[in-house]
């Protein structure tokens, strides 16, 4: 028998109607409109001061005036404690129970106290408040601006020329499972260039190429082909090179079946283990006369040269820490676009730990005081970065400044390398023609087959690499001319007018105008002269080496005292310019050709430092620069015009004061960003001027440089302005030819990158060098301004990984707000409503706290790091290489705005992501409704009775078996990421079912359960990207028929809480409210999750899964406490509830 109140006979709408017996049309729009008539009538009677009607209605109501029992999400009746207290914030007729639950209390039915019954408002999950909408639009707008800037502004020009080759590969089948357990998965090949290499015998120096993440063994072909052609066409005909120990290179390459090493640490270790055995096998080939064709007088090779691309460079460094590493088998490593400083992504715990082990080993090795204690003393490491065009791995991560001292390695950008002068993307660095030529020639230059290591000593190797990869203008550049022997005997007439007056500039607009060989002698100022003199020379003509017969040669000469009957046969080259005069002077001269610096040609017709396929080849400028102390032992600089016919070409040479050509602008970064910086080069200026701006260090900012036009007073310009921007460390230079405007960006101090072994001085910053025509007697005005729109694009590469962490910061705060409201009012509000509430208080307070935290750590950092700069060998055991790992990866107060900026972007992303999830669940719900079959002969009433149940709880045994099988698979065969993906799919289906019930049978309980499952689904989706990479690696291993069980990620505890929680939600159980202090546990867990995601999430993203897993563990426990909070409630997780489920209303 039904129980009715005098005010209304409608039952509580908060109690869900049972799905199996639900009448979906009962709550249709039509019925809800008709049920509104009694309320309207009551209101009308009340306004007319007439007694209300006491007639009893059989229709359902929104409120049951006495509700001794409440129902959960599946309709199960839950007994509630009887003690009650009135809630001050509850509406009339609502009371708060002892455990914090809102209930209705019985109201005395008198004509004066009759209150019309109203249905609780339906809270649509699609609804969004104006403030949340504005925040989402601002966030998405800023994200679009960042993406648009990254593809349209501050872009480096693409200048790679195409390369060609004729490759062939010989598989070394004898390297099988007898040598390594991984031989069934990986393969070793020997590269051979067709038409050049006649067989597969090894006869040269072994070089091992290691492909990168998902790379192919065939990527070795551009560099290997260039090496084969260069030796065949040039080196084998160079007797001096052959005598110096140069031989051809035998390139070995490894087929890793395109393994994904960036996402899986164990794969990285497996490759390193395999390669160590491969190196041992490769070295053994040179001992086997059947496959080796070498001079028996040469020593057997004991080491290989390693060339690594991308993650292959990390694998190369990992080889040296593996137990099966053969000592001294690797002493030269060249890497291209390899992320040495930190992992490209931090989704895998083993990857992060492997990186830490590798980097700690290298730092510890180079921190040893004595060479005998350093296992890496003979190892050189050169890291080559592609620059701004590399959008796969941030080039900031290629830095090795925090790993090796400059005596053993360095980082250089391709835009710095002479005759390359262009940025490259992640793949182009392998096939770029001008770059591969430099790499091949540099390797040949360090080869010496007369040594067992097959390479020159470490110091000589470093000297060679600096010569090939650096500009030659760095402070560490070594000048070769002062250390060489005199090679040229120059004889000049004493009465010649070829001596330039001291202090004057030599300017030649054309060569060979005298019709004979002519020498211009420039006196060298004495060492220690005031002004710190330096000599500079610029020409568009190639400088001759001793014995060559070109157009121009530069010599440093000393007067030879006249002695009777002295022999001059010791000079390989002699030039007599005395014309038979009796009064002549002989000079012993050294050639400056070894120290020539190549600069990109800058004329009125050039646009880029490089030329492309099909374009006319551009001859670079030749530049010399010496401090007076470097050439103080000589008396003259001789500029010799060797051509006797008029030839186009210019020469500008001068001695200038260092103080006139160098200046430092001490301007704060804030002032520069606000007002810009202006300076001018005076009319009477040196040919080369340099301006250093110490405040320009951040890689997050971009600038625009503008140079005014110079007036040459009618004379033709010798050359157009040439600008070089450069950093001292890492070695990054960019050239701008025919410069009028230039876009300036750099790879300096970058987020999340460890500090260098030797702390950077405050004076280190971006520098600009200007080569301008000094014959143009007009000043040049230069302006440097910040490019704010261009700077937005720099955030993309540096902060794209924040989307693995900061959205969880937002989601955790929203979930926390939803639970707090639910425990207080009994309403589990939708996700967007929770987001709106968080935007009003929680998120701003949290962002303010995080900003203050970053500011405080930035203030304390300098004092704690002061000891970094005083270390005996360049590093320190107390140096904190992880202090940039937190929050936004930088302690610069200028970038504190990035914290709220990233948060507002994540608010927009979370909003869009939420709507995408809503769309997905609704579409799946519609599809599920369409596939539901209802025969046409079934009437409407019967069709309502046949509505399928939303939640059928399987038997406890079946649920336990399913869970046990899944966990058993995790323990033995599949990674736990697979189980997590299954859990996400199950949760999606649960959310779809909850959405169908909530939309068809609108009630508070159904709405609560749907909003709860939807929010849990959103949380799991944001955790999913952290788990997907490992799952992809596992699928890839299956695809390559590698059936060995996955050797990592089998911890069932890492996924069991999620499985239990998702299984519980499939039964339709709503999480119970907690009115005691235990509700603060959920709040603290979600608060801690939000803080952890913001502070540590970017660097340790893999830990976010564990944090969310612990939250799922707690929620599963709360689910087990449906009746009371006790451990006995745990049995409810897998107990059948069909017996206690009510099919309709209680009689």
Swiss-Prot record:
GO terms assigned for molecular function: phosphatidylinositol deacylase activity
The UniProt record lists the keyword Protein transport: yes
Chain segments annotated as transmembrane: 127-147, 795-815, 843-863, 893-913, 918-938, 965-985, 1015-1035, 1052-1072, 1084-1104
Record carries keyword Glycoprotein: yes
GO cellular component, one term: endoplasmic reticulum membrane
Keywords attached to this entry: Endoplasmic reticulum, Glycoprotein, Hydrolase, Membrane, Protein transport, Transmembrane, Transmembrane helix, Transport
Composition-biased stretches (Low complexity): 50-63
Residue numbers annotated as active site: 310
Glycan attachment positions: 23, 74, 865, 873, 1011
S-S bridge residues: none
Subcellular location: Endoplasmic reticulum membrane
Region annotated Disordered, chain positions: 1-94
Function of the protein: Involved in inositol deacylation of GPI-anchored proteins which plays important roles in the quality control and ER-associated degradation of GPI-anchored proteins.
Name of the protein: GPI inositol-deacylase
Gene: BST1
